Amino acid sequence: MTTIVSVRRNGQVVIGGDGQVSLGNTVMKGNARKVHRLYNGKVLAGFAGGTADAFTLLERFEAKLQAHQGNLERAAVALAKEWRTDRALRRLEALLAVADAQRSFIITGNGDVVQPENDLIAIGSGGAFAQSAARALLENTELSAEEIVKKALTIAGDICVFTNSFHTIEVLEYPTVTPV
């Protein structure tokens, strides 16, 4: 499978993923790009699961973003609804992690759109390892979101045999509002 991690902190939201594509117990490719910028660079998306399935869902999600003028939540709900009700899409096995300047979501084939606690997402075979590492770093360091994603992916790759050390990391910066 893979590992995808997303962290939001101090005016940055970051999604990173490894590059391993496996077929059974064989590594087929080590430098796949599983994290992408969508909607003119305003939305980040990462996927875990079957590569062909995930690319199909990514294309559908991008179409939903266009149809909903970049509204991440509406696009996510529309994709989840279509994914759940369309007979062909229901067979696709993948998870999407998506984020914009305001929100982050996990979209599943069961029709779930989940806004994670603490704006931390970790999916895929190494997701639990990456989530544990990222959570510890969020709670105990002042590292940037990008540094946390890099370290979480590295730790997951050291533990999970379906996660490698080739990382794609996308950073979306946004202004932070300081209370007066």
From Swiss-Prot:
CC per GO annotation: HslUV protease complex; proteasome core complex
Reaction catalysed by this enzyme: ATP-dependent cleavage of peptide bonds with broad specificity
Keyword Cytoplasm: yes
GO biological process, one term: proteolysis involved in protein catabolic process
Record-listed Na(+) binding positions: 157, 160, 163
Source taxon at top rank: Bacteria
Main location group: cytoplasm
Complex formation: A double ring-shaped homohexamer of HslV is capped on each side by a ring-shaped HslU homohexamer. The assembly of the HslU/HslV complex is dependent on binding of ATP.
Protein name as catalogued: ATP-dependent protease subunit HslV
Record organism: Tolumonas auensis (strain DSM 9187 / NBRC 110442 / TA 4)
Gene: hslV
